[in-house]
Regions:
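FAD-site-proximal beta/loop scaffold in flavoenzymes
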Residues: 120-141, 215, 219-221, 227-299
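Glycine-rich Rossmann-fold phosphate-binding loop(s) that bind the pyrophosphate
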Residues: 9-12, 128, 149-152
């Protein structure tokens, strides 16, 4: 009897792959090992839980048992894979070996928590998963003042949602502007103004050096010398791929588990996708590349030839009162063609030959996003 396909992880990437495989083959044996309960949920909804007044339970689409039954998989919930033997093609769990025909790492990423001193530093919370939100939801619902460490995509989305739900929010960001790695300054400034209008305090070009207890509050001491009182401190300082298991079994790992266009790792019959994978040198923690990865990998697991081809992809910043959508590569931009109106911004990024390299649209101008995405795709094919 053929050994099953084994998937480590039960997040969006893992379950997208399961669905893809099952659309093509209803019976090939699939085993999923996960450290949590295996519940299916929509992770992007975590950006809106506070304003939507949702509990962790509200976000669950299906229990792990229901998902396993519907998709005919063997689910090992609350089960940590201790080791992978890539020569023998086995995973080791609780001292028992489980053989695989093909193995997929879908181990995701964890929220990065910067090293910070102070007696309250261990009380920092993260919101990168349903389980983390479940642990923190009562604490956050009681809190009036919340400090968000990090002004990137996750930090900005959470901050706006918390403010919309009535919390007093401060965002601390070491860069001189928000979303510094994602959008140009002329888009960041109106976003910052919108956040300020919603009552959000911004502490830019500084970081949190220490968090200590003070009476019933937490006090965050900033590197610039200022102190901010808060009831809760959330770390939204980016993600780090979960690679320890891959490293331990000898796979090639950089920021993520290194894979080629076929999602193959450095070991035979071992693959990776999702937030843990570094695809040809790129980390892509967004839904669309994961869906496309799952489609390509699903075919390969069933013996078909398939390569991942990534078109220009849209990134949506989920900030409802100032929506932003963007696509493309801004690294070689020499010129921005910008239209600014009262209803938003439409900006095209061009190289020295006036070729479209990317775009950013905001506010009501987001209606231009899909026509610009088509134009960007055509420019890439020219």
């Amino acid at each position: 009897m053929q050994a099953p396909i084994v998937i480590i992880g039960s997040g969006f990437a893992a379950y997208q792959l399961v669905k893809t495989v099952r659309r093509m083959d209803a019976h090939i044996p699939l085993q999923v090992f996960t450290a949590d309960d295996g519940a299916e949920y929509n992770k992007p909804d975590l950006s809106h839980v506070f304003s939507n007044k949702q509990t962790a339970r509200d976000l669950v689409v299906k229990s792990g048992e229901a998902f396993a039954q519907e998709h005919n998989i063997e689910l090992f919930a609350h089960t940590k894979v201790e080791h992978v033997d890539v020569q023998a093609q086995q995973v080791l769990v609780n001292g028992q070996a489980y053989p695989y025909s093909k193995l997929v790492f879908a181990t995701g990423a964890k929220a990065f928590v910067p090293p910070i001193s102070g007696d309250a530093a261990p009380e920092m919370i993260t919101l990168n998963s349903l389980q983390e939100y479940q642990l923190a939801e009562e604490q956050i619902s009681r809190a009036k003042r919340i400090l968000v460490m990090g002004g990137g995509l996750i930090g900005v989305e959470i901050a706006m949602d918390l403010a919309t739900s009535g919390k007093a929010v401060t965002v601390v960001e070491p860069n001189p502007r928000l979303l510094a790695n994602l959008i140009p300054e002329f888009v960041a400034l109106p976003l910052e103004n919108q956040l300020k209008q919603q009552g959000i305090q911004l502490a830019l070009e500084t970081g949190v050096a220490a968090i200590n207890h003070s009476n019933d509050s937490l006090v965050a001491s900033l590197s610039q010398g200022k102190a901010i009182e808060a009831d809760v401190v959330i770390s939204a300082a980016g993600l780090r791929a979960n690679t320890w298991l891959a490293k331990a079994c000898g796979l090639s790992v950089n920021k993520g588990i290194e894979v080629n266009a076929r999602l193959q790792t450095s070991a035979a019959n071992v693959f990776a996708l999702g937030d843990c994978a570094e695809i040809q040198g790129r980390m892509m923690p967004y839904l669309q590349p994961i869906v496309l990865s799952a489609n390509a990998l699903g075919k390969q697991l069933l013996g078909q030839e398939a390569e991942l081809k990534l078109p220009p992809m849209m990134v949506k910043v989920k900030t409802p009162s100032y929506p932003i959508q963007l696509a493309g590569d801004f690294s070689s931009v020499t010129n921005w063609s910008v239209q600014i109106s009262q209803t938003g911004i439409a900006a095209k990024a061009e190289d020295e030959n006036s070729r479209l390299m990317g775009f950013v649209v905001t506010g009501e101008q987001v209606t231009q996003a899909f026509p610009l995405l088509r134009e960007l795709s055509q420019a890439g094919q020219a």
